[in-house]
């Protein structure tokens, strides 16, 4: 009798729980979760089109299902963002999917559609996944055609493609003769696509605006420029914070490649701007040859990520299109570096070559340092030497500056660098004052600290 009462109680609780659960909760779809076994035996292509909006931010609806109820959430008057992942050698869902969906919905009430083609991307044979890219593009075209028939416009379509997903975006764009609004390619896949003609890969003609981020050009990514603007963080290789040896396991292979996604997500947070400097090469950027962005006035230098389309009008008008932008990042989110130009006018009679370390100190005691040690600088009498300094912290009010000069040599005499004028020019925040210091001597390997003063107008 007591046992019967116990089971009846459990049944009652179960009924109450089921009554309290909404219909929508029972119909939520999730990203396909596979494993290495699936990768070994292979998976046939099956695509879910997982829709998220502010009405269903935590409960995806699959628009690729027959008689899907998800279309009740699809408002074609909104902008639609497609997020398309790439090759999945182990079958696990991308770890960044939930974060990027949330960040998009925080910004605006988009239709966010996660293109889950994990069944098709999960395989140990990369070329099989690459062969499925056009099939995925065909499926996306059917959905977009459906949306257009309900009143959507191609202008409102924005595709964010990662690795192979970048080329899928390009294939979709080609089907509409480049009329879709925008494509962002996040480290487009290189293997099987490098050297291919435009019709077989992502190209700037695939959308009204195409911006691309390259973070693994010496590995899994595509090296050459593909968009109206191509960003090369840290030169497109060896991202800070990523493992340098194979002993780190799978992270060694995927960290650089994935960094493009995390840089993009950082741009959605709007903590700071990842400013790119248009330049011919990474070396030219490093030695300070590319800090002039007058061609974009009244705008500043372009920024990577979601807000890159603010520079669209300037970039698409170039003939031929194609701008490369370089910059360095920090190792961790939000990844920003804060750039300054450091100008030296010296009056030493002999030419000196060496390296500079500069520290900035704020009124509240914070300190940030930049070591300009990748390329030696040449200091000639009465000739200005300009160096690009990059700092991890953004110090608003600089109270003190310290500078160290070294030749890098451990033998021989110690040198002096006689400085007629040193000037610190902010590049990331160009509205801040330019600071100077006049007539001082740097002794090799001896740190010199001083209080900067506003530059004289004649020296700006």
UniProtKB/Swiss-Prot annotation:
Disulfide bonds: 242-255, 279-290, 293-301, 436-455
Ranges that cross the membrane: none
Residues of this chain annotated as glycosylated in UniProt: 67, 75, 177, 289, 366
Keywords: Cell membrane, Disulfide bond, Glycoprotein, Hydrolase, Lipid degradation, Lipid metabolism, Membrane, Secreted, Signal
Xref: InterPro entries: AB_hydrolase_fold (IPR029058), Lipase (IPR013818), Lipase_LIPH (IPR016272), Lipase_N (IPR033906), TAG_lipase (IPR000734)
Membrane topology (UniProt): Peripheral membrane protein
Pfam family, one: Lipase
Active-site positions on this chain: 163, 187, 257
GO cellular component, one term: extracellular space
Cellular compartments annotated: Secreted; Cell membrane
Functional description taken from the UniProt entry: Hydrolyzes specifically phosphatidic acid (PA) to produce 2-acyl lysophosphatidic acid (LPA; a potent bioactive lipid mediator) and fatty acid. Does not hydrolyze other phospholipids, like phosphatidylserine (PS), phosphatidylcholine (PC) and phosphatidylethanolamine (PE) or triacylglycerol (TG).
Name this protein carries in UniProt: Lipase member H-A
Gene (name only): liph-a
